[in-house]
UniProtKB/Swiss-Prot annotation:
Name by which UniProt lists this protein: Urease subunit alpha
Urease domain segment(s): 134-573
Modified-residue entries (N6-carboxylysine), positions: K222
UniProt family annotation: Belongs to the metallo-dependent hydrolases superfamily. Urease alpha subunit family.
Localization terms from the record: Cytoplasm
Pfam families associated with the record: Amidohydro_1, Urease_alpha
SUPFAM superfamilies referenced in this protein's UniProt entry, alphabetically: Composite domain of metallo-dependent hydrolases (SSF51338), Metallo-dependent hydrolases (SSF51556)
Pathway as given in its UniProt record: Nitrogen metabolism; urea degradation; CO(2) and NH(3) from urea (urease route): step 1/1
Any GO CC annotation of this UniProt entry: cytoplasm
Source taxonomy: Bacteria, Bacillati, Bacillota, Bacilli, Lactobacillales
InterPro entries attached to this UniProt entry: Amidohydro-rel, Metal-dep_hydrolase_composite, Metal_Hydrolase, Urease_alpha_N_dom, Urease_alpha_subunit, Urease_AS, Urease_asu, Urease_asu_c
CDD domains: Urease_alpha
BP-aspect Gene Ontology terms: urea catabolic process
Amino acid sequence: MSFDMDHEQFASFYGPTTGDSVRLGDTDLFAKIEKDLTVHGQESLFGGGKVLRDGMGVSATETRAENPMVADLIISDAIIIDWTGIYKADIGIRDGKILAIGKGGNPDVMDNVDFIVGASTEAISGEGMIVTAGGIDLHVHYITPSIAQAALDNGITTLFGGGTGPANGTRSATCNPGAWYTHRMLQAVDNAPINYGLMAKGSGSRPELIGEQIEAGCAAIKTHEDWGATAAGIENSIAAANKYDVQYAVHTDSLNEGGFVENTINAFNGNTVHTFHTEGAGGGHAPDIMVVAGQDNVLPSSTTPTNPYCKNTLDELFYMTMVCHNLNPKIPDDVAFAESRIRKQTEAAEDVLQDMGALSMMTSDAQAMGRVGEVAMRCWQLASKMKKVRGPLDGDSKYDDNNRIKRYVAKYTINPAICNGISDYVGSIEVGKYADLNIWDPKYFGTKPDMVIKNGMITYGIAGDPSSSLPTPEPVLERFLYGAEGRAVNHTCVTYVSQYAYDHGIKEQLGLNKTILPVHNTRSLTKANMKLNNYTPKTIEIDPQTYDVKIDGKLITCDAAPTLPLTQRYYLY
């Protein structure tokens, strides 16, 4: 005779199941579980007197050496939030990669087992917890090495950007200057407990100028107006990107000195381009850079300073711009330059375009107008705001915001991975990919992950007083853990380089210890490749006098948010 359990009691033991909804932090968003791949009555619960014991949920006979389906780690009964779906499953990890997603346990006594829990398997209790893929930030100024910890604080596990420290060039532009600095930066990040990729400086009128940086190990190219965003620089950078199969990103000409947005689009010549802070407050043709989001070949992203649009956004942006771009408040032309980039109309429209899926990615612009520790948080704040402003998306309903949730999680996971040619490795929770995962308590979702797993090992997470008798006493802080220590970093973290540098032995040439992987498949991408964020308006019009934005003839705007979720309730200081 089967045992009937009260639904509430079941959820308290094993976490929610199909049809149950989970609130994300203090937002207005609810994730509804679409399916449950575990087997009811045979859940792989760990703990005293529970299931994962020898001969019960743990196989007494299968060895890791003899059976490739024996996992190194099981995350049991987890709620997975990914662009691929919102569902419940056990996650099996082996050799740092996702081995299986479904039911983990002992096939000798359990039904429908997808991977085996053996004597060599570690356990993380995922009951009632949310698992997402590690976040990817494609717009990071490498000003301080401490940025790695700030990123991990919000579940960001991969950084792409450029720079050499607090030099003025780095404070303005996310690009690495030359082969010598590229080599030094590859060595500098070799022990950093996070994935890194470097972006070459896309300036000059010969592709060879950019190409030498790609050959030195850069994994992408960035043109920035502070170094000159001319048509020639764009065209030659794209030529180098096409030759070496790396992504090309651009921060366009705010002052319209070398041409207008139409000239820049012509310089793209139909090639794949990642446009940074596409709204324009972070930089770009004033006032109409956002029209590039209507181009099929453009992969558009936003940055955290303008998302979501709030009552204090405009005031903050002016001072950010002055500092980041080495401007002098005593020079009227410098002040005018900063003011030209700040437009409430385009910032309001940007929120809506993100919600429509016309803007495909979210990035930080870290320490140069944005905050690397807010990428995930800002995404979910924006999603919650847009639910209030625009209501449920098509297919969503009360206690079911799955379509909106999947759209927004894609903005900082799978889409950046696709954009920069690393989606074969990371960016989603799929079998065969590296296990870069975040585990969240739902009430802290989007703010502070309980654990950050890098290539299958806990690298960062919540831990209590090291001198206490338990792991839980205060002070409970986010701390670096064993995956971030010693030579483990060589296996838990990755540096991405160009295929050329990989093939020509950059790891051996520079004596690097980290895992080195090549980027690829970046040059034939279009907006259609952006998962759940591929809406391409037929027309985007920005009035040069009023800055009003129209999409396919319809005015697009929203009010500044007076308050936001995921704020002071979670961050007291």
